[in-house]
């Protein structure tokens, strides 16, 4: 079985799950994304995505943004154990800006990891 699958268990699906991550308010943001984090007590990370109509009016664009974030999470989930993340898009990006947006997302997750490491030690 591949370690790079994005199973249902790795997704935040219910309103309560999203609310619990938002209530902790451990977050970092940049021009493209705002990422909220909360320890979940599981052996794997979970992710939830929020892309509003104010960010991207067309569903095609919103789905593209979510697809890009899901793909990044799928490929990098091994290093993100035991945390629930909610990724909120702040700005829509085009295919030409995808690499820049993914780099920005990587930087936010790295900042949150450093923050969690410093607060736990």
Swiss-Prot record:
Write out the catalysed reaction: Endonucleolytic cleavage of RNA, removing 5'-extranucleotides from tRNA precursor
The EC code for this enzyme is: 3.1.26.5
Whether Metal-binding counts among this entry's keywords is: no
Q: List all membrane-crossing ranges.
A: none
Q: GO cellular component terms?
A: ribonuclease P complex
Q: Is the keyword tRNA processing in the record?
A: yes
Write one Gene Ontology MF term.
Answer: 3'-tRNA processing endoribonuclease activity
PROSITE patterns recorded for this chain?
RIBONUCLEASE_P
Gene Ontology biological-process annotations: tRNA 5'-leader removal
Tell me, in a sentence or two, what this protein's role is: RNaseP catalyzes the removal of the 5'-leader sequence from pre-tRNA to produce the mature 5'-terminus. It can also cleave other RNA substrates such as 4.5S RNA. The protein component plays an auxiliary but essential role in vivo by binding to the 5'-leader sequence and broadening the substrate specificity of the ribozyme.
Query: What family is this protein classified in?
Result: Belongs to the RnpA family.
PANTHER family (UniProt xref): RIBONUCLEASE P PROTEIN COMPONENT
Instruction: State the NCBIfam families in the record.
Output: rnpA (TIGR00188)
Report what the protein is called: Ribonuclease P protein component
| Source species | Chromobacterium violaceum (strain ATCC 12472 / DSM 30191 / JCM 1249 / CCUG 213 / NBRC 12614 / NCIMB 9131 / NCTC 9757 / MK)
The gene for this chain is: rnpA
